Amino acid sequence: QPEFRIGFLGDEAAQDVLTRNSCLKPYIEAAYGVPAKLFTFEDYAGNMQAMLGGNLDYTWYGSSGYAGMELEKPGFVVPVLTRMQPTGDMGYYSVMIARKDSGIKTLADTKGKRLGFADPNSTSGYLIPSIELPATPEVNGSLENYFSSTEFSGGHSGVVLAVLNGDIDVGFNWVS
């Protein structure tokens, strides 16, 4: 039996993601006349591979995820929607976060600190910062020479938790 399969990035608790998005099911089922199924994935790569493997019909990605799939299988995915904020702005922004009590207020304050990224396929949590940070006068070309360490923290929620727990000093996430 045909079904409409929707994938979600699962860097939050999978059940929370499914519960929060279950309201989509009746709309999809009414619009397409087939059952809708919701899936979460541990990371961007799993979601991307499910889409490229024909196991999803719809999912959300940032530009980095879309570009990665386009490079791997040109023309297979088609962008159909973009996010619009209540202000009318389109998209979202990459931001560096730190604990309020860290004393970190500027990029210069992050020298020698531990840096966390969200996911290798995240536009806001890795791609943009990995290009833009080295271009700043402070970092001057090398993340490795500026920060004491860099790591992936397991997604956007993982970055927040790692900063809160003190596992990293600063990390990249998104805001809209």
Segments from the language model and where they lie:
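Pocket-lining segment of extracytoplasmic ligand-binding domains
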Residues: R114-S176
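Short loop->beta-strand "edge-of-pocket" segments that line small-molecule binding or catalytic clefts
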Residues: R5-E12, V17, D109-Y126
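Extracytoplasmic/secreted proteins, especially bacterial periplasmic and envelope-associated proteins
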Residues: T19, C23, Y27, G46, ...
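Short Pro/Gly-enriched coil loops immediately N-terminal to beta-strands
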Residues: L81-Y93
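A bilobed periplasmic-binding-protein/Venus flytrap-type ligand-binding module shared by bacterial periplasmic
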Residues: L9-G10, Y93-I104
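Short, polar/charged alpha-helical segment
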Residues: E3-F4, A13-P35, I131
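Short helices/loops that flank or line small-molecule/ion binding pockets
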Residues: A45-T59, E72-P74, A108, G155-F172, ...
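Ligand-binding "clamshell"
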Residues: M69-R83
